[in-house]
Each structure stands twice: as C-alpha cells, then as structure tokens.
Amino acid sequence: MSKITAKDVRKVAQLARLDLPDDQIATYTEQLERILAYVAQLEEIDTTNVKPTTRAVEVVNVTRTDEVSETPVREELLNLAPQREGDFFRVPKILAE
C-alpha cells in the first residue's frame, strides 16, 4: 500500500469541502495512515466461513395480532374538542394566506 502524502490529505479535504489549516495537515496525514493500516489488517482476516450480513445483531419486527375493539363514537370525540365546526375539529390558523 502506498503511503499517504500531505497532497493526498489536501485533496481529500478539498473533495469534502473542508478548510483544513496547513498546521493540521501532518496530523491528518498520520491519522489516515493509521486508519489505512488498520483496514489492511482487516483485509488479512479469513472470512470465507462468515456469511454476509448487514447488521451485528438480528433485527426482527415485533408485532401483535389485530384485535377488534370498541372505540368512542364520532360525536363523543368531536365533543371533546375545544372548538369544532360541524364534523371537524377547529384549530388555530398557523399559516398566512
């Protein structure tokens, strides 16, 4: 693997639209080198018997069965509103025309 240069770091910063001060270039160059060295270590791991996955833990949907239940009648619900207009709830206007 080729070594990361200050020019590489400046290019990545430019592509990411980051304004990276010159005094931080060396720091980021070193950090990127360490990251790439770690990735190189990961590439050496034998994963032939590991099945592909997108999550570290299995995710399942928790569902319940639908049950028919009684709900308050329409008129009772409308009567609970502070203001109503016919069969609708009346709410304060929030947008100008």
Swiss-Prot record:
Role according to the record: Allows the formation of correctly charged Asn-tRNA(Asn) or Gln-tRNA(Gln) through the transamidation of misacylated Asp-tRNA(Asn) or Glu-tRNA(Gln) in organisms which lack either or both of asparaginyl-tRNA or glutaminyl-tRNA synthetases. The reaction takes place in the presence of glutamine and ATP through an activated phospho-Asp-tRNA(Asn) or phospho-Glu-tRNA(Gln).
GO molecular function terms listed in the Swiss-Prot or TrEMBL record: asparaginyl-tRNA synthase (glutamine-hydrolyzing) activity; ATP binding; glutaminyl-tRNA synthase (glutamine-hydrolyzing) activity
Class in the EC hierarchy, top level: ligase
An individual GO BP term: regulation of translational fidelity
Superkingdom assignment: Bacteria
Stored SUPFAM superfamilies: Glu-tRNAGln amidotransferase C subunit
Protein name as annotated: Aspartyl/glutamyl-tRNA(Asn/Gln) amidotransferase subunit C
Subunit structure: Heterotrimer of A, B and C subunits.
Entry keyword set: ATP-binding, Ligase, Nucleotide-binding, Protein biosynthesis
Family label: Belongs to the GatC family.
Catalyzed reactions: L-glutamyl-tRNA(Gln) + L-glutamine + ATP + H2O = L-glutaminyl-tRNA(Gln) + L-glutamate + ADP + phosphate + H(+); L-aspartyl-tRNA(Asn) + L-glutamine + ATP + H2O = L-asparaginyl-tRNA(Asn) + L-glutamate + ADP + phosphate + 2 H(+)
EC number: 6.3.5.-
Any one Pfam family match given in the protein's UniProt record, by short name: GatC
Species for this entry: Prochlorococcus marinus (strain MIT 9313)
